[in-house]
Amino acid sequence: MKIPEAVNHINVQNNIDLVDGKINPNKDTKALQKNISCVTNSSSSGISEKHLDHCADTVKSFLRKSIAAQSYSKMFSQGTSFKSLNLSIEAPSGARSSFRSLEHLDKVSRHYLSEIIQKTHPLSSDERHLLSIIINSDFNFRHQSNANLSNNTLNIKSFDKIKSENIQTYKNTFSEDIEEIANHDFVFFGVEISNHQETLPLNKTHHTVDFGANAYIIDHDSPYGYMTLTDHFDNAIPPVFYHEHQSFFLDNFKEVVDEVSRYVHGNQGKTDVPIFNTKDMRLGIGLHLIDFIRKSKDQRFREFCYNKNIDPVSLDRIINFVFQLEYHIPRMLSTDNFKKIRLRDISLEDAIKASNYEEINNKVTDKKMAHQALAYSLGNAKSDMALYLLSKFNFTKQDIAEMEKMNNNMYCELYDVEYLLSEDSANYKVLEYFISNGLVDVNKRFQKANSGDTMLDNAMKSKDSKTIDFLLKNGAVSGKRFGR
């Protein structure tokens, strides 16, 4: 895909490299083997510690690149949106993904960069100045969660990685995301302009959503990351009244507050979401912002954007008002260079959903709170938390009866415990614990949801053979046996 000559006329302080760098997996493998060989018999070769560190870094770099290739191969070969846009690649024939998927990322990035260059060339002096500020800005990347993801090291895993390790946690990745863009092997971050003295983070929501009470902030990008101007799946910018900093814009501007709500997309319609690799992302952001400013009828907003002395916080307000930047790192982030900032308290239910043991232990200090926690665990199908609480507290049948009577817990108000133990998302081991320890009656008829049914009826509806067999061995019968 040819990049138009117009790119050569963008005069910015940074040298924007748009050259198509080819990746040769065989060459990289040979280079790796050469570096690995240097550590063989190191005890007798007298190799310096610095040289060994270099070899270790080479291995880490190669592994990181290989993992990234797998994540992008999955995204570009499985996502139906890429297929409909003719931006897909073939799935790898073998077990391993080649580096072609990384080459493809660069090609896709150049494609979207070429589109916006053609649309915005030539630039005025004000536009070139704004673009140079953005290109030379440092970014902070913010991941929010109710989970405790760090001790001395921050470890954030993709949904696909979490699932492969059988870790149970509340997810923000839905079936539509997986089907259409298949980016469930990436870790997601909001993006902020740094170089300011304000309290971090500048933003606490993304696309109007509060993703958690803990903000984990890093100030370094990934050589294999990619950026979208919006949420990758939902590329509609919300109206100003849903914006976190709405008062800033409502108090200062008029026309632009009605212009901001829109789909951000490429030339092939609203499902065509621009993607930029790490190298191209600042240029992509800057040119798309200039395109929006040109279309705006709000003269005061335009003047504000082109202010020669615009400060980093104001620039961030603009960018995360016009867009909702989202950065993606393949599979997993592990770093000791981060900041953890507590934004608010975490509710007990949110701590349960996030499997935040530290927070749960701080909140659940007596049997009464344990009743609440167990109800939240069953209601959210959090078997790991349910089994943890059952092992920590000596629950009796009377405790379960008292738990069911709680009027300040939605799950106890709407469902019988027996229903929660046997519905389609329930866990067999939790059900087994309750019945084996005599905490519930196997044939108690539901009094709330699905009134008159029993646990066997629930299991039959979900066609869970393992649960059905266990219930039958313990004398379970259908509620129909009792009549209605």
Swiss-Prot record:
Positions with a binding annotation for NAD(+): H143, Q144, S145, L149, I162, N172, F188, H206, F211, D231, E326
Q: Which Pfam families match?
A: Shigella_OspC (PF06128)
Major location (coarse): secreted
Q: Where are the ANK repeats?
A: 414-444, 451-480
Q: Where in the cell is it found?
A: Secreted
Q: Which reaction does it catalyse?
A: L-arginyl-[protein] + NAD(+) = ADP-riboxanated L-argininyl-[protein] + nicotinamide + NH4(+) + H(+)
- Does the record carry Repeat as a key word? yes
GO MF entries: ADP-riboxanase activity; toxin activity
User: According to the UniProt record, what class of enzyme is this?
Assistant: lyase
A GO cellular component annotated for this chain's UniProt record is:
extracellular region
Which residues carry out catalysis?
E326
Q: Where is this site: Important for catalytic activity?
A: H143, F188, F211, D231
Query: Which keywords annotate this record?
Result: ANK repeat, Lyase, NAD, Plasmid, Repeat, Secreted, Toxin, Virulence
Query: Its Enzyme Commission number?
Result: 4.3.99.-
Q: Quick check: keyword Lipid metabolism in the entry? A: no
Q: Explain the purpose of this protein.
A: ADP-riboxanase effector that mediates arginine ADP-riboxanation of host caspases. ADP-riboxanation of host apoptotic caspases (CASP3 and CASP9) prevents their activation, thereby inhibiting host cell extrinsic and intrinsic apoptosis. Does not catalyze ADP-riboxanation of host CASP4/CASP11 or CASP8. In contrast to Ospc1 and OspC3, not able to inactivate host calmodulin.
Family membership noted in the UniProt record = Belongs to the OspC family.
Write down what this protein is called. Answer: Arginine ADP-riboxanase OspC2
Which species expresses this protein natively? Shigella flexneri
